Amino acid sequence: MFSSPLLLTTALCATGVLSHSPNSYHFDPLRHLAGVAPPFDPIDPPLDPAPPQGCNVTRAAYLVRHAAIFANDFDYETYIEPFTDKLKNTTVDWTKVPVLSFLATWQDPITDAEQEMLTRSGKLQATKLGVDIAQRYQSLRTPKKIWTSTAERTVKSAKSLTHGLADDESDISVVQIQEGEEDGANSLTPYKSCPAYSSSAGSDQSSEFLEVYTKPALGRFNAAAPAFNFTATDIYGMSLICGYETVIRGSSPFCNLELLTPNEWLGFEYANDIQYHYNTGIRIEKLNE
């Protein structure tokens, strides 16, 4: 058998793009956005990926997520779109609300058609990951196949990966695996392989904390712009936009620390922790008992 990296793709994430000096720490909301945070290496300096002295890599397998998308459909339809629709219909003069004055000219970076689609930066992430893998395992043969689920964002991530992995991407076949109930190949999307899984698990617990951590921000915003009637889900949607817009446009005015405090960003992060703790973490068994 020859040595070759086996690449299993449900979605791709790239190596870190955010960093800070340990001697000049500055709170960065982009590091506290849970699943919508742009990729970064949490360890400074990053760990050396080389094997221990005296060891050699003879085979490598990668199971990775898709690269950056415009927006998760649930996030967009539940939080972002209701907030942006509310913005379109409001009569508030944002130029008279200092911390929110950018809303007078701000435009939504996401459309309905772009939901779940791969962004340009996402394609770059996937390509860079391919380059990183090729350079890291130069002694291994380039794989002939990459397996992917059939979601468009995943297929495009896999194809972008081949651009960086091989000198000629046509040397690698991107194989789409059907995941229907009759096909049985559902390991690339774990929740489809577990009949007991519930996508709503954790929502109640997370929503309860959402009402708690957003209270200070609601007090400030509704005092500044009472006609808009900010809600807890508006605050959550603004935090989501910070991450998604940064990936799409390179930056976002919603990431401003004058808009939300570090504690409020940490509240957003913890609300997501609660959601996933009960949804796919160790507490899932307790909910199913």
Where are these regions (language model features)?
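Short glycine-rich or small-residue beta-strand-to-loop segments that form or flank ligand, phosphate
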Residues: K145-S149
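Fungal secretory targeting signals
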Residues: M1-S21
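Signature for phosphate-centric chemistry
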Residues: H20-T142, E152-E289
